Amino acid sequence: MGEHFLLEMVDITKEFPGVKALDRVQLKVRKGSVHALMGENGAGKSTLMKILIGMYKPNEGKIIFDGEEVTFNSINDALDKGISMIHQELSPIPEMTVAENIFLGREPTFGKSGLVDNKKLIEMTRNLLESLEINIDPRKKMGELSIANTQMIEIAKAISFHSKLVIMDEPTSAITEKEVAQLFKMIESLKKKGVGIIYITHKMSELDEIADDISVFRDGKYIGTDTAKNLTRDDLIKMMVGRELNQIFDKPEPKLGEVILSVKSLTKQDYFEDVSFEVRKGEIVGFAGLMGSGRTEVLETIFGVKEAESGEIFVNGQKARIKSPQDAVKNNMGFLTEDRKLTGLFLPLSVRENMITVNIDKYINMGWLNGKRVKKDCEQQKQKLYIKTPSIEQIVENLSGGNQQKVLLARWLLKNPDILFLDEPTRGIDVGAKSEFYNLIFELASQGKAIVVVSSEMAEILGLCDRILVMHEGKVTGELTREEANQEKIMQYATGQAKMAKKLHVHNNFEQTVTANKIEIG
C-alpha cells in the first residue's frame, strides 16, 4: 500500500444526538491514487467526507494532510489546504459562462478598479481546461452543457484551487457509458499530476477500471482496506453487508402456475420487432441485453406507454386491448419504471400520497376520501415492506433510494396486480437494500404474481430469474433457463454472437456493456 500517505484520518468518531455515526474510523489515501470508498447507505461514507471538507467537526480523532495535522472549521479551510469535493447533485449557475463559474469570486481584475478582465479570465480558463484535456468553450453558458460536461467543469474548478485531493461522490450516476470513459481518462490525467482521488460509488464494475485501493465501511465502522486487485466482488459484498453473495439471492424453489401473460409477435418500429414470450403465475422472467437492445421499450409497449405497430397481448388467455397505462392497470398489470424520480415518484408529495396515486378511486366514497382507510393501508405497507421513514407523511424526496423504491412497490401492492413489470428495480440503491428488495420479489412470486424484470446487472438477472430472455438490436436472440444461464452465454446472445436455438419468450433493456468477467452489484 506504500508508506507515505497524502491523507490520514485516524480514529475519527462522530456522534449526533442518540446516534454514533462514526466509530473510530480510519482512512489512508496515497498521493496520485484513486481510493474507492464502499459501503451501504448509512455506512458512514458521507459523514466522513463532510468531516474531511470541514462541514462537520469530529468528536474524536485527527486528520493528517500532506504530512501536517490539520483542523478544518469550514469548507474554505479545506479548500485552502487543497481538498475539494465534487458533489453528486451538481449546482452550477446556469446563466453564467464556464469561465465565470470556475473562477467565481476569484476573477482577474484591472488593477484596483475591481472591473473583471474578461480577456484574461477566458485565457486562464482555456489554459486550465487544456491542461486537463477538456474541450469546452470557456464562453459557453453552463446551462447549455450536458451533465457529464458540467461534471468536468466542476472537476476543473476543483483543480483551479490547486487541489491535491479531490473527492468524487457517485460521479457516474447520471452519465452515459461514453461519458464515463471520458471521466475515467480525466481521472487518470489527474493521477499523473499526483492528485489523490477519493471515489465514492455503488458500482462495483467501475472498481476494476479506476480504483487502486478500496476501503469498506459498515454501520459507521471501518471494516478494512486493500488494493483493488486483491479484492474480489464476493470479498467486497461480504465486507459491506456481512453476508456471502449466495445469501443475497436466497431464492426459493418456484411454484409455477398457468400462463397468465402471453405476448405474440409484438413490434414497435425503430425499437424492437417480432417479440414473443409467455409468463406463468409465480414465475420471474428476466430480460437481458445491452443498452438500446429494446428491453425497456417492450415493457412500455405492453403497458400502453408506447403503441405497437403489430402483435397481440393475451392476459389469462383473453386478448387484451391495451392502448394506455390505464388499460394495462385494468388488466391487472403494474409497472415500476426505470427512473423512479423522473417517471415514478412525485417527489414533493408524502409517502402516503405517493402510495395511493393509482389507487385513489378505491378510497373515495360519495366524493369523499376515506382518510382513515388510507392511513391504515399505507401504514400496513410501511410495516410490510420495512420502509424506513418516521411517518407516512414524510416527503418522499427525503427518503433513501431503497426506501423510495419500496414506496413505488407499495403503490402497486395496494393495487394488487397479477402481473408486475420491474425495470431496473434496484438501480441506485445499495447492496443491503437490494437484498431486502430481492426477498420482496421472491415473496410476491410465491404468492402467484407473474414478474418480468429488466436489469443491467448480470448478477441480478442470474440471481432473480427462473428464465432469461436476451435481446440484441431489438430482437430476442436467446432464451435460457436458470440452470442453463451464465454470464458468458448471456453476453454471447446480447452481442449477437450466438444464434437462438430455442423458441421465443422475451423482454427488454440491459444497459451498460457488461463484460463476461464482471458482475455489478451496486
Swiss-Prot record:
Residues 7-244, 254-498 form the ABC transporter domain. It catalyses: D-ribose(out) + ATP + H2O = D-ribose(in) + ADP + phosphate + H(+); D-galactose(out) + ATP + H2O = D-galactose(in) + ADP + phosphate + H(+). One of its GO terms (molecular function) is ATP binding. Keywords: ATP-binding, Cell membrane, Membrane, Nucleotide-binding, Repeat, Sugar transport, Translocase, Transport. It comes from the Bacteria. InterPro entries: AAA+_ATPase, ABC_carbohydrate_import_ATPase, ABC_transporter-like_ATP-bd, ABC_transporter-like_CS, P-loop_NTPase. CDD domains: ABC_Carb_Monos_I, ABC_Carb_Monos_II. Coiled coil: none annotated. The keyword Acetylation does not apply. Its main location: membrane. Gene3D superfamilies: P-loop containing nucleotide triphosphate hydrolases. Its EC number is 7.5.2.11, 7.5.2.7. It is a peripheral membrane protein. Belongs to the ABC transporter superfamily. Carbohydrate importer 2 (CUT2) (TC 3.A.1.2) family. Part of an ABC transporter complex involved in carbohydrate import. Could be involved in ribose, galactose and/or methyl galactoside import. Responsible for energy coupling to the transport system. This is Putative ribose/galactose/methyl galactoside import ATP-binding protein. It comes from Halalkalibacterium halodurans (strain ATCC BAA-125 / DSM 18197 / FERM 7344 / JCM 9153 / C-125) (Bacillus halodurans).
